[in-house]
From Swiss-Prot:
Family: Belongs to the transcription factor STAT family.
UniProt protein name: Signal transducer and activator of transcription 5A
Subunit structure: Forms a homodimer or a heterodimer with a related family member. Binds NR3C1. Interacts with NCOA1 and SOCS7. Interacts with ERBB4. Interacts with EBF4. Interacts with CD69.
Function field: Carries out a dual function: signal transduction and activation of transcription. Mediates cellular responses to the cytokine KITLG/SCF and other growth factors. May mediate cellular responses to activated FGFR1, FGFR2, FGFR3 and FGFR4. Binds to the GAS element and activates PRL-induced transcription. Regulates the expression of milk proteins during lactation.
Species per Swiss-Prot/TrEMBL record: Sus scrofa (Pig)
Location in or out of the cell: Cytoplasm; Nucleus
Keywords assigned: Activator, Cytoplasm, DNA-binding, Lactation, Nucleus, Phosphoprotein, SH2 domain, Transcription, Transcription regulation, Ubl conjugation
């Protein structure tokens, strides 16, 4: 109920937005009287697109109706009597509305609760950060709403003027008919005697002169009314076009940009509900003005009067048609983007939505949407309106979907749930470009009929660029292409042009955004971390971040050329760091236990003056995704020790916390935190000796323990034969089963008589292998090499 209490505190525009959420589909009184019950139900646990969850949705509907009926029965007194009737009516209404579509009730209530929470959150953020001052966003939204009010008033004014014109014209036509009747009477005068004819003719002439003078004046008045009305429509359309530009070219483009950055881990793009409400208001006002213009044209055709009006009306009619065309085509958008790294033969989903579908009654004749994959060059040709002859660059299964209208939320959308890219056709690559740098896009297209088929629009929209892969080993480099494109794409670009070079601070922002999203942590990259990355990328020794602010990073430096002295690119190393943190060390990173971004020399400088047993965890330079332990311990040979890096494979066998727990001579986490205080909550519980030795099915369960034999002997010598750490006896080496193949073992369709041979996919794999073979042996990505230590007899050696 706390959510509803907060929602009731909303004021101004936020309160109006909340009120719009309710209506006949879900009355606000139901929300009020069943607030606690509604907020305690598992609405989010139901997948509205999964038919198997329908029974649960039906049960929630039945429970809602029962709760309403119980609430109604408990009402007493005079006021209670009216409320009892009203709640009972709502119970019946909801039962009838959602009985055949209980999923729509779930969708409706989720939509309401989500937007209530959003409005409350925005109101709280606004009040805490800006106080009584209205922030820039609210100010802009206020201006948009004020313009809508102005448009409503001028549209009402032209409606009144049109009615006035129609009434004036109808009276004019009546008088014109009277003039024709008088002319007919002149023809009948010959049948009268001369005296009566003369008398009658004089009266008719006076009447005719008076009437013709009136008709001439009224014709001028009518023409003036028509011109004034057309001029008012011109001004209205100017204001409409300006408002539409703000909404479509500013607000909607900003939403799309947020959606693109969300692909890099940025904050969610936010709800489309406010944008849809604006677009629907635009559609409503545009359609009202279009109908007015058509009625004005009809009046002109009914009573032609020479003048400039016909040309003016033709111009405003063409203008309003252009405006509505731009609105319909621009509001056909991709609400849920397909994955930007798209693997063949893998199911994927996407959702497209028409923001004006409800207002323009497009849903009355549900349109079908088709999805195809096209190349970057085909996308360029499409935007130039060049004929592509329905060309595509691959085959997508389940690529057609009918748009559905959801009454509760007022949304018209098509949900592609089970698409799959069967095959891809690649273009010839340029220079050093690899297959993971080639961009495609999913084209969604449909046809919408508006206003009883008065207008028919062919609509198309392109997804964000996608990189197609055929093997998981290509994922890392494909992600680099997507990251660079999402971060540095410019508005209104030619598909899919991106700058080849960007400033280092720009890349820092993109890396930090991606890092926090992948590791799912609020602990991002610090200034010191960014200095370390700059040193690594630019092969520099400067420790001042400002020294790098004017330096540029090229795409080749980022993920095409190996770092100087290493067999990997900058991105491959950074991606390996994110992967190992995401899979194994999120809590340790969030706790600040992993220093990470320091090199061997920096670790030496940090530890040299610390007590024995002080250690730090840093990311390995020599192995992608490796974490090494550096610690201080004085011995005859050395005082700083570095353990051979552990990788994801090692942490799958034994966790970092347990490995640190095994090494009792590691005492303090740098700078001075007791190890057990930091890591003990992550230790695997140790079995009691009796239970550990107990045989299970005739077998005694072994235990794996981390030891460093070389350090044990060194520390024994240092202790003068009275070793403190001799309880860390060497244990038998535990070696994982060797895997020599680069790719998982998949059935070969060439050798399998029942298999389907796919030439495109086979060529794609061949290109990938060709890329590997082109590289010198020392430049191979370690993730594609045989596992480190595969032929070693022990693990945990020192360096």
């Amino acid at each position: 109920m706390a959510g509803w209490i907060q929602a009731q505190q909303l004021q101004g525009d936020a309160l109006r937005q909340m009120q719009v959420l309710y209506g006949q589909h879900f009355p606000i009184e139901v929300r009020h009287y069943l607030a606690q019950w509604i907020e305690s139900q598992p609405w989010d646990a139901i997948d509205v697109d999964n038919p198997q969850d329908r029974a649960q949705a039906t049960q929630l509907l039945e429970n809602l109706v029962q709760e309403l009926q119980k609430k109604a029965e408990h009402q007493v007194g005079e006021d209670g009597f009216l409320l009892k009737i009203k709640l009972g009516h709502y119970a019946t209404q909801l039962q009838n509305t959602y009985d055949r579509c209980p999923m729509e009730l779930v969708r409706c209530i989720r939509h309401i609760l989500y937007n209530e929470q959003r409005l409350v959150r925005e109101a709280n953020n606004g009040s805490s950060s800006a106080g009584i001052l209205v922030d820039a966003m609210s100010q802009k939204h206020l201006q948009i709403n004020q313009t809508f009010e102005e448009l409503r008033l001028v549209t009402q004014d032209t409606e009144n003027e049109l009615k006035k014109l129609q009434q004036t014209q109808e009276y004019f036509i009546i008088q014109y008919q009277e003039s024709l009747r008088i002319q007919a009477q002149f023809a009948q005068l010959a049948q009268l005697n001369p005296q009566e004819c003369l008398s009658r003719e004089t009266a008719l002439q006076q009447k005719q002169v008076t009437l013709e003078a009136w008709l001439q004046r009224e014709a001028q008045t009518l023409q003036q009314y028509r011109v004034e009305l057309a001029e008012k429509h011109q001004k209205t359309l100017q204001l409409l076009r300006k408002q539409q530009t703000i909404i479509l070219d500013d607000e909607l483009i900003q939403w799309k940009r947020r959606q693109q950055l969300a692909g890099n881990g940025g904050p969610p793009e936010g709800s489309l509900d406010v944008l849809q409400s604006w677009c629907e208001k635009l559609a409503e006002i545009i359609w009202q003005n279009r109908q007015q213009i058509r009625r004005a044209e009809h009046l002109c055709q009914q009573l032609p009067i020479p003048g400039p009006v016909e040309e003016m009306l033709a111009e405003v009619n063409a203008t309003i048609t252009d405006i509505i065309s731009a609105l319909v085509t621009s509001t056909f958008i991709i609400e849920k983007q397909p994955p930007q790294v798209l693997k063949t033969q893998t199911k994927f989903a996407a959702t497209v939505r028409l923001l004006v579908g409800g207002k323009l009654n497009v849903h009355m004749n549900p349109p079908q949407v088709k999805a195809t994959i096209i190349s970057e060059q085909q996308a360029k040709s499409l935007l130039k309106n060049e004929s592509t002859r329905n060309e595509c660059s691959g085959e997508i299964l389940n690529n057609c979907c009918v748009m559905e209208y959801h009454q509760a939320t007022g949304t018209l959308s098509a949900h592609f749930r089970n698409m799959s890219l069967k095959r891809i056709k690649r273009a010839d690559r340029r220079g050093a470009e690899s297959v993971t740098e080639e961009k495609f896009t999913v084209l969604f297209e449909s046809q919408f009929s508006v206003g009883s088929n008065e207008l028919v629009f062919q609509v198309k929209t392109l997804s964000l660029p996608v990189v197609v892969i055929v093997h998981g080993s290509q994922d890392h480099n494909a992600t680099a292409t997507v990251l660079w494109d999402n971060a540095f794409a410019e508005p209104g670009r030619v598909p899919f042009a991106v700058p080849d070079k960007v400033l280092w601070p720009q890349l820092c922002e993109a890396l930090n955004m991606k890092f926090k999203a992948e590791v799912q942590s609020n602990r991002g990259l610090t200034k010191e971390n960014l200095v370390f990355l700059a040193q690594k990328l630019f092969n520099s020794s400067s420790s001042h971040l400002e020294d790098y602010s004017g330096m540029s990073v090229s795409w080749s430096q980022f993920n095409r050329e190996n770092l100087p002295g290493w067999n990997y690119t900058f991105w491959q190393w950074f991606d390996g760091v994110m992967e190992v943190l995401k899979k194994h060390h999120k809590p340790h990173w969030n706790d600040g236990a992993i220093l990470g971004f320091v090199n061997k020399q920096q670790a030496h400088d940090l530890l040299i003056n610390k007590p024995d047993g002080t250690f730090l965890l840093r990311f390995s330079d020599s192995e992608i995704g490796g974490i090494t332990i550096a610690w201080k311990f004085d011995s005859p040979d050395r005082n700083l020790w570095n353990l051979k890096p552990f990788t994801t494979r090692d942490f799958s066998i034994r966790s970092l916390a347990d490995r640190l727990g095994d090494l009792s001579y590691l005492i303090y986490v740098f700078p001075d935190r007791p190890k057990d205080e930091v890591f003990s909550k992550y230790y695997t519980p140790v079995l009691a000796p009796a239970s550990a030795a107990k045989a299970v099915d005739g077998y005694v369960k072994p235990q794996i323990k981390q030891v460093v034999p070389e350090f044990v002997s060194a520390s024994s010598d240092s202790a003068g034969g009275n070793a403190t750490y001799m309880d860390q006896a060497p244990s038998p080496a535990v070696c994982p089963q060797a895997h020599y193949s680069i790719y998982p073992q998949n059935p070969d369709p060439v050798l399998d008589q029942d298999g389907e041979f796919d030439l495109d996919e086979t060529m794609d794999v061949a290109r990938h292998v060709e890329e590997l073979l082109r590289r010198p042996m020392d430049s191979l990505d370690p993730r594609l090499s045989p596992p480190a230590g595969l032929f070693a007899s022990t693990r945990g050696s020192l360096s």
